[in-house]
Amino acid sequence: MDLEADPWRVNSEENGNNISGSVWEPDNSSVNALKSYSADSLQQEANKRVNDDYLGVNIFSNGDNIVRGTASNVYQNDVLWDRPNIGSTTQETDIRGVNRFQATDTPQYAANDEYKNWVESVRKTYFPLAEDIVSVEEIPEREGLVFKHTNYLVKHLTPLPNTDPSDDRTVVRRYSDFDWLQDVLLRKYPFRMVPELPPKKIGSQNADPLFLAKRRKGLSRFINLVMKHPVLRSDDLVLTFLTVPTDLSGWRKQAHYDTTDEFTDKHISSSFMNLWRKEFSEQWNKADERIDIALDTWVKVTVLIERYEKRMKQVAHERKLLGQILNAIPDTTEALYPQSTATVSQINEGVGLIVEHLNSCADVIERENEEVDSGLSVRFKAFIDVIIALKGLFERYKMMAGNNIPQLQRRVEINQERLNTLESNPDVKGAEYDRVKQSISRDKRSILDQMNRSWLIRECILEEFTIFHETQFLITDCFQRWIEINLRYTNNNVDNWEKICKKLRDMPLQRH
C-alpha cells in the first residue's frame, strides 16, 4: 500500500471494523509519512513527479533546482533573417518575395490588420476549456499469457467526421496503441504540440492499482488534448485510432499508412512571409528560457493542492473514527452515573447528535475530495501537459530544424567563380563545364527547398504559439474552480457546525 496516499492505513484490509489505537496511529517512522514540506523537499517531490509521470521529460536533471537560464537564441540565429539576401537563388522558385524580405526590429505587426486577422483565424480553431469528448476506462480483465497487459475502453462522445464508428462508439485499446499514435503524430507533426504519454512501466507496478489509475488518467488527458488540437484531431490515423473496432496492432501490420511530415509537397505562402516579424522569434526565445521555471512552478502548485486534499481525506477518516468511538459513551455513562438517569439520557442523546454530525462532516470532505480528484486535478495536470507539449516542440526545433544554407550558398559562389573561369577558357572540356553547372543548379534547388521548409516550420511554430496563448485561460479556470469548490464545501461544513451548535444547546450543564 502507498503509505503516502494512506499513512493512517485506513483502507487496509487488516482494519475492518477494528478501531484499536495501534491501527490508527500514523506511521511516523516511515519516510512516506505525510509531513510538512520544506522548500527543498517540495522541489524534490516536483522533480520526481515530472520525471515519473511523463515519458521523455527530464528537465530536472540530478534533482537540481530550476534557475534562471540564458536564452538559447536558436530562433534569432535563423539564417533566413540573418541572411535575407540569397542572391539569384530565388529566381526559379515558387517562394515569391524571399529576396525582398527584410526582418524588422520594430513592432509593426501589432498594428498590422493582416496579422491580426491571421491570429484571429488561428485562435478560433482552439478551445482548451472545451469539455473532454473522449473517455478512457480500464477494463478489469487483463490479457496475456506470460506478461499481462491492461486494455482500455476508449469511447468518443461526439460524432467524428468522415468515420464509420461502432454503434456504441467504443474501441478497445492497450497502452502500446497509444504509444504508436504518439509516435506517428511526432513523425507527421514534429513542430506541433504533441502531448506526452504517461510512463508504461512493467513488472510489479503493472499490478499496482494506484499506478494503473494514474496511467489511465494520463492516457485520457493525452487523447483529449489531441482531440482539442485543431490539426491533430483531423488526422486520419487519429480517427482510425478512435473508430477502427479491430485489434489495432493487427491493423498496423496489414495497413499502409502515410507518416511523412506535414510539409511534404507544401509551399510557403507569400502572405505569411509578409506578416512575419523578428519579434516573434524573440518571444519564442523568452518563452523557451522560462518554460522550465513555469513547469516547475505548476508541478509544485499541483503537488501542494493534492497534498491538502490528502490531509483533508485523513481528517474525514478520523472524524468517522471519532464517531465510532463516541458510540461507546452511552454505555459507559449509564454505568458511571446510575443515579442521574435524566441528565445522562440527555447527554447521551447529545452524543448521538455529535456522532451524526461527525459523519456528516466526513461525508462533506469525501464529496469534496471526489470532486477535486475527478474534475479539478485533471485540469491542473492538463495545463502541465500543455506546457510540456510546448517544451517538446522547442526541443524538437533545436534538434530537427537546422539547415546548411550558408554552406550551400558559399559553395554556389565558389562554383560560380569557377564556372566563369571555365567560360573564359576555350580549352576546357564541355563535360567539366556541365558538371559544375549541374552542381550549382542542385545546390540552388537545395537552398530553395531548405528555405521553403524553414519558412513552413516558422509558420507552424507561430500557429502553435498562437493557440498556446489560449491556454492562459486554463489558469483562470483552474483557480476559479478550486476556489468555488472550497467555498461551496466550506459553507456546507459551516452549516453542519451551526446546526449541531443549535442542537446541543439543550444538553445539560448543571442540575435544575
UniProtKB/Swiss-Prot annotation:
Using the UniProt record, give the first listed, main subcellular location.
Answer: cytoplasm
List the subcellular locations.
Cytoplasm; Membrane
What is the recorded membrane topology of this protein? Peripheral membrane protein
Coiled coil start-end:
none
Protein name as catalogued: Sorting nexin MVP1
Q: Name one Pfam family in it.
A: Snx8_BAR_dom
What is this protein's gene name?
MVP1
Q: Where is the composition biased (Low complexity)?
A: 13-22
What PANTHER family does this protein's entry cite?
A: SORTING NEXIN MVP1 (PTHR47554:SF1)
Query: Which species is this record about?
Result: Kluyveromyces lactis (strain ATCC 8585 / CBS 2359 / DSM 70799 / NBRC 1267 / NRRL Y-1140 / WM37)
What does the similarity note say?
Belongs to the sorting nexin family.
Determine if Transport is one of this entry's keywords.
Answer: yes
